[in-house]
Every structure is written in structure tokens, then in C-alpha cells.
């Protein structure tokens, strides 16, 4: 039977590290923890689970720290997690059964990073369990990843990201600015640097850098589509609604229409009181297939609740109260929000 080395990097994670390690202790064979400078009780907690704790002097490079952890691994496969990740019981049971049959080079698991009443609302696949050979290397100082290699299998189980505190919100941008002084960013770095600018509300800088990204070769399709979506959001915020719409339509050059893009196009028409057009685009969102198997980011709300609410409101203004009520009820089947209840009460007056 193949064995698995868990490789982690941590810093000041006393609030979450025990929760994480409790969720993996029954299926991993070795726990390696690299500490990048904790001043709390993280190490004391980790010692309950392993004596393989190593110090690493932080150098503004997540990949170097993670690769150092991998270098200490003894077994055929490595698994990596963040301290605020949790392996659900269902996934634990699945991996215990899988271990005797590990043969692939790379196993991808879903990563749930946002929740509504414990139901995942934002998910995507990450490379999670990998053969421990010279291909198993993280790249990227920030937003680091291992490029999936060899035979790859996607597993229909998930890791949950359960953050309990926010970290240094300026750290990633600071690291990217440091890299930019030393060399030109590659396409992946350019994408994530632009996202950091957006998150810091530097919208004009974000636009400039995303437009630069559009001219770069070797941009991953998912990053290219999302970069156009972010460009659209920037122009929306900057008050240029027509450019915002243009960038949404440009995403269609790279793949079939995504649910979130269809909803945003529908929002444009709804805001402009063009309700037949908004109906069309909200319906397209409900027909869209999720893109998680392509490596895309899936925001579940755009596949059902959000377009159902949009259809409810659009049909209301078209005076088709039967259809308005129908889609409000469909939205209510997903979640009974304040908006659903208000619509229900309002529509009762028009359904008499």
C-alpha cells in the first residue's frame, strides 16, 4: 500500500491547526510541518501529532517554503493543506479506501472556499495528492501551485477551507511589487497581480495590467475568461457601462457562456429596463453547465438562485405575474431569503 506524507507550512495558526490535523491523522502516514516564524503556540499544538517540525526563514516566497516541506517527505505520495483547511469526514473515508489503490500521478480534489449555511457556494479543483518525485514542485512566490503532471484523476470529494481570521491583506501585493522590481511577471503572475490590484480598489491600475495580460501568450483559458470578467467589473465601477458589457461578451471567444457572465449581461439589460433581453440572458444562465471539470471557478448562486430572482423581477415588469411567481418559487427552493419572502407577499396581490 502506498503511503502519504502530509506537507504543510504554517505561521501563527494555533486557532486552527489542531482542527486541520485531527481531520487527516487517520489516513496520512507522516505529518511534516514547516514553520515560517510562529510566535504563538502553533508548534506546541503540532507536537501532539508529529515531531517532524522544521523552521524556515521566511523570504516572501510560498513555493520555496512548500518545496522545503516536500523535501522532508519520506513516502511515495505527498498531500498538501493550509492550516485552516479541513478534510470532511466523507472525504476522509473516501481517501482511506483509495489508499490501497493509489496509482495515478496527480489526484485533484474539489476545494470549497465559501459557504452559505454550510453548503459550498464557491468551489474549484486543486492538485492535492501527488507522486513524490522531481515533478512535484510548487511554482509562484504567491498563489503558488504545482502544475498537474502525468496521469491525472479528478475525485468527487472535497477539502473545505474554513478561515477564522484575516491575514496580512497587503502581503501578496507587496510581494508582487517586489518581484516586479526584479523581473517581468509571467502570465499567471500578471493575472494574480491584477486581481490583487482589484481587491485593493486600484481599478485604473487593474485595467492597465489586465489589458497587458490580454496581449500575453500562454494565458490559461480560465484566467483569460476571469480577467475579462474583472475588466468588466472595473469599468462598471468606473462608470463606463458599455465597455463593461463589451468585456463580458468577449469571454465568449474562449468558451461557451458561463453562468456568472450571462447573469451580468442580464443585469445590464434589466438595469436598462430591457426586460425581454434580461429574461433571455437569465435563462441562459440556468442552462449553463458548471465548469469545475475544466478547472474553472464555480459560484453556485449564478446557476440557480440569482437568475431565478432575475427572472422573477423581469417577468414582473413584463406583467407576466404567473411566470414571475413561478421563478420566485424556484428561487425559494434554493434558499428562502428576505427577498423571496417579500416577492411572495407582493405577488399574492397580483395573483388574485
Which stretches of residues belong to each language-model region?
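A conserved acidic beta->alpha catalytic loop
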Residues: 23, 35-45, 58, 82, ...
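Acidic helix N-cap motif at the loop->helix transition within catalytic regions
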Residues: 15-18, 40-49, 90-91
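Short, well-formed alpha-helical segments that are part of the catalytic scaffolds
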Residues: 7-27
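Catalytic-site signature of metal-activated, phosphate-bearing donor transferases
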Residues: 2, 63-70, 87-212, 218
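Short aromatic/hydrophobic "clamp" motif used to bind/position activated sugar donors
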Residues: 78
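Cell-envelope/extracellular polymer assembly enzymes that use nucleotide-activated donors
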Residues: 2-5, 30
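Conserved donor nucleotide-binding strand/loop of the catalytic core
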Residues: 44-68, 72
Amino acid at each position: 500500500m502506498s503511503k502519504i506524507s502530509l506537507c504543510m507550512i504554517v505561521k501563527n495558526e494555533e486557532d486552527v491547526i489542531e482542527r486541520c490535523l485531527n481531520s487527516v491523522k487517520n489516513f496520512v502516514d507522516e505529518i511534516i510541518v514547516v514553520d515560517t516564524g510562529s510566535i504563538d503556540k502553533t508548534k506546541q499544538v503540532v507536537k501532539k501529532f508529529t515531531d517532524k517540525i522544521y523552521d524556515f526563514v521566511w523570504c516572501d516566497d510560498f513555493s520555496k517554503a512548500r518545496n522545503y516541506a516536500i523535501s522532508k517527505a519520506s513516502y511515495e505520495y505527498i498531500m498538501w493543506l493550509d492550516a485552516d483547511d479541513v478534510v470532511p469526514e466523507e472525504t476522509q473515508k473516501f481517501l482511506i479506501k483509495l489508499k490501497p489503490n493509489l496509482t495515478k500521478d496527480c489526484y485533484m480534489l474539489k476545494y470549497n472556499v465559501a459557504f452559505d449555511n454550510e453548503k459550498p457556494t464557491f468551489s474549484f479543483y486543486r492538485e492535492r495528492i501527488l507522486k513524490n518525485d522531481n515533478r512535484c514542485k510548487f511554482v509562484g512566490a504567491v498563489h503558488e501551485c504545482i502544475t498537474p503532471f502525468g496521469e491525472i484523476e479528478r475525485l468527487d470529494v472535497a477539502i473545505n477551507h474554513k478561515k477564522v481570521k484575516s491575514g496580512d491583506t497587503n502581503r501578496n501585493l507587496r510581494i508582487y511589487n517586489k518581484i516586479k522590481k526584479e523581473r517581468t511577471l509571467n502570465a499567471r503572475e500578471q493575472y494574480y497581480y491584477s486581481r490583487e490590484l482589484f481587491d485593493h480598489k486600484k481599478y485604473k491600475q487593474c485595467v492597465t495590467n489586465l489589458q497587458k495580460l490580454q496581449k500575453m501568450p500562454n494565458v490559461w483559458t480560465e484566467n483569460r475568461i476571469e480577467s475579462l470578467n474583472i475588466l468588466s467589473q472595473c469599468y462598471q465601477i468606473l462608470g463606463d457601462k458599455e465597455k463593461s458589457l463589451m468585456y463580458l461578451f468577449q469571454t465568449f471567444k474562449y468558451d461557451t457562456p458561463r453562468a456568472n457572465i450571462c447573469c451580468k449581461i442580464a443585469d445590464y439589460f434589466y438595469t436598462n429596463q430591457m426586460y425581454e433581453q434580461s429574461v433571455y440572458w437569465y435563462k441562459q444562465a440556468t442552462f449553463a453547465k458548471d465548469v469545475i471539470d475544466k478547472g474553472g471557478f464555480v459560484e453556485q448562486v449564478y446557476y440557480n438562485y440569482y437568475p431565478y430572482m432575475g427572472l422573477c423581477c423581469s417577468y414582473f415588469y413584463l406583467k407576466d405575474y404567473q411566470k414571475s411567481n413561478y421563478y420566485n418559487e424556484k428561487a425559494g427552493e434554493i434558499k428562502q431569503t428576505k427577498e423571496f419572502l417579500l416577492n411572495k407577499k407582493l405577488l399574492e396581490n397580483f395573483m388574485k
